[in-house]
Every structure is written in C-alpha cells, then in structure tokens.
Amino acid sequence: MDNVVKIGLLLAGLLLVQTAGVSAAGLVFAPRYTISEAPGKPLLIKEPKIPDLSGYTAEAAMAKISYKPAGSALIQPMLKENSLDEFIGGKERLKEWVVRQQRMPVAIFIDRGYMNLTQLARSLPPTALRETAPGVFLARLPIVIRPGGTLHIDKSVKELRLSQEGGSFLVNDGKLFITDTKVSAWSEKDDSPAWYKKEGEFRPFLVSWGGTETYIVNSTITSFGYTASKSYGVSISQYSPSMAPKMKRKRPTGWLLNSQFVDNWYGFYCYEADDVVILGNSYRDNIVYGIDPHDRSRRLIIAHNDAFGTRKKHGIILSREVNDSWIIYNRAYNNHLSGIVLDRSSVNNLVAYNETYKNRSDGMTLYESGNNLIWRNRAVDNDRHGIRVRNSTGVRLYENELMANALTGIYGHIKDLRGSDRDLKEDPYEARLSLTVVGGKLIGNGSSPITVFSPSRLELYDLTFLAPQKQDGLAFTGLLGEVQGDLMDILLRRHAAALILPETL
C-alpha cells in the first residue's frame, strides 16, 4: 500500500529539528545536529504496572462509616473557627456572609460523632435547614463538620440544596460521606440550580481540610464554586501555609466514585492531598477545569473518568509538583483548550490508555514537566497537536496513536518564559527538551507527524505513519533534509533507532 510505511524511524511530511542561538552580533543561528544509528531494543520497555482498582467500590466506602457515637449539632458564630478562617479573612470575605445573613454570621456545626442529614435537620430550626418536599432539603447556613464529626448525606435524601442567597456552603474538618444522592448549589430566586452566570458571583461550595476524609459515591454535584480562594467547587485541601503549622494535620484524602460533577467552577481541586481516588466519574460542562489536582499532591489515581465540555480551559490538568500519580483510562473531549495537561514540574506520572479528542487545543500537553511516561494513548481530531511537550526532559512517548490532529502528531519545543505571568521563583524551569518516541501510529496529522525544535536529545524508533497529508509523500526537511540519505539508510536498511544530538564544538 503506497500510503502505508513502517520503518524503524519514519518521519512523514515534515520533521523539523532545530536549535536556535544568538551570536555576539545578535544574529540567530542554528547549530548542526549529529544523527547516528543506535540499537532499538534497549529502548523497549515492559508495559507499565497500574494500580488495582477493584477495592475502590461503594461497599468499601460505606464500610468506612462509624455510626457510633451519635453526633450533635448546634448553631454558633463563624468567627474564631479555624476551619472557617479562610472565608472570614481578607478581601471583605466576612462581609459576604454578613450581607447574606443580615447579622454577624453563624453556621451549623456538627460535633464529634455521626449524623445523617435527616437527623441534622431534625435537630435544627427550619430557618437553618428544612425539608421542603419529601427527601428534599434546603440549607440556608454554612454546614461545618468539626474534627471527630461525621456527616452522611445518604440515599434517603433526594437532594440537598445549598442556598446561594443564604450563603450556605460545606466545610469538612472531619469525615464526609455523600452517597446515592444529589447536592446542588441552589438559587432560591430562580428555584433552580445556581447555574454559572458570571465570574466572581458567589456560589456554594465544598472544601475538605487537612486530616479529613471525603467520600462521594454514586452522586451528583451541581453548580458549585466561584473564584474566591478554596471556594472553587469540590476541593480537598491541606490548610494554607499560614494555618498548617498551627493545625498540624496530616494530608487530606478521599474517594470520588461513579458520580457526576456538572457546572462547577472547578469540577475537582486538591492541594497537598495524598492518595485521592477519582474513579468512574463524569465531569461535564464545568467552567475552568474538569479535574485539577494542584500543588504537591501525590499518588493520585485518576481513572475511567469522562471530562468534557469544560468552558474555559482543560479537561484534566495536574499542576505544580503533582507527582507519582496515575492518569489512566480517561476520556477528555470537547474541552475549550487541552484534554489532559501536566504542568509546572509534575513528574513521575503515568499517563496511559486515555482518549483525547475534539479538544480546541492539544490532545495532551506537557509544560515544564519531565520524567513522565505517556503510554498507549489516543489523541484524535484535536484543533492543534496530538501531544505537545515544552521545556521538559526525560519524557517518554510510547505506543501512542495520534490521528487527524490539525497541526502535528507530536510537537516538542523549548520556550523562554521570562516576561510571562509565570512566577519564576515559585515555578522555576529549564528551557531544555529531551524526548524518546517509540512505537505507535501517526496518521493523517495536518502539518506534520512530528515537529521538534531545540532538543538536547531525541530518540525515535519503530514508528508507523499512515496517510501522509502531503502529495509528495514522505520527505525530510529542515536539518534532517540535509542528511536524509544517511538517515533512511539507518532506519530502513539497518532497522535501528535514530539518536539525534546537538553537534558539540
């Protein structure tokens, strides 16, 4: 078949390998590269191991509930409560609740012990929490679970509505179980979920602090969150740097299983959280991100989720030292920017068996995040690149299928981020790039299957290209065009890998 070629290294259409420097006269120059034969077998690796997911079930989550002792609830002032400090501090946040409650603000507090929502409602005046229809409850105050307390919103609850007008929200400083139910931010004025209308408008939210456990199972969370700190939607967060030394809490954790998250500012956010499991969920039409693990979170399992319709940015993003995690078997599609992103020094992660398609930017994007394995993913029909890698070293792209992306299948480059809005002290980086690309298929990508600028090391082996876009078929251009004969000899006749390095002076 004329349009099918399989070789040890096959670069169809256009493969650019360039590095730019500046001479004393200020002229840009492109140093030469050496292209040499290398054995291919040492590049082969075993299929990576993935975590056993069989233990993360509704039954296992329910088994974690301690029903005794019984808890108690009371209404008290919000002031001088550590778990509320974030929400009554600077930038007139206290004023938000004063205006909504028309008094010095108070909240519902669950003290040590177990309560379900029905028990909680029975213990409180209806002005704070009431049943408006069988199984439907409206909360008009914040609800705070204190250390040692457990709140269970269970299947006897058809829906818990957190009043937008009343300024209700959920703070977990103990244990929270949301199972087989629905929890919505609620507009009493519109008698509907508090659908997103404009940036900065208060909407109820959930935050679980350091030392807590959160379990959301077979449930729907709708219209949570806005722009204020730790009020993003569904958040699992260690206490802030100013509070953490005082609180001395271990990192928070939780499971989110087989649930739906719709119209939230962030579908999920975490900060310095460990061992969170996000499994089998749907993140639909969220505003900024679908799934957004952040700052120094570790050992996360993000598996079998659908993240789609995100309106401002990405479906799934791991940002700022989110390490040692598994992003596996997800689908990220129809998002405003990229499907899956690793960002700001997120390293030692496995991104495998995912599908990213019809995103308005890249299928997958790696920014300043080295030493990650991208294994056997599919990126199809994205508006820019299948996989983009920037300022990242030790990135391994193995057995990926990259098809019909508007620009390139794989795009690697460096970029000087000085002058951007990046805080270079908080997020340092090196403008270096090294890639190993082994196996997989690149099919009908728009401008080229692979384009790489300024690598410090590039290894390619055993790639398959189908249906090259250009009428003249296979052609090497740029620096590789100068050595195309030697390159094809290495790849076609010797069936070896190609090692591409900058020429040393």
Can you describe what each PLM-predicted range is?
Residues G8-Q18:
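Bacterial N-terminal signal peptides
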Residues N391, V452-P455:
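Exposed, low-structure sequence patches enriched in small/polar residues
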Residues T212, F476-L479:
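Pro/Ala/Gly-rich low-complexity, hydrophilic intrinsically disordered segments
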Residues N3, A24-L27, P449, E459:
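Conserved, well-structured beta-alpha core segment at the onset of a catalytic domain
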Residues A24-N323, A332, I340-V341, V347, ...:
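Beta-strand/loop edge motif enriched in small/polar residues
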Residues P455-Q471:
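C-terminal/domain-terminus segments
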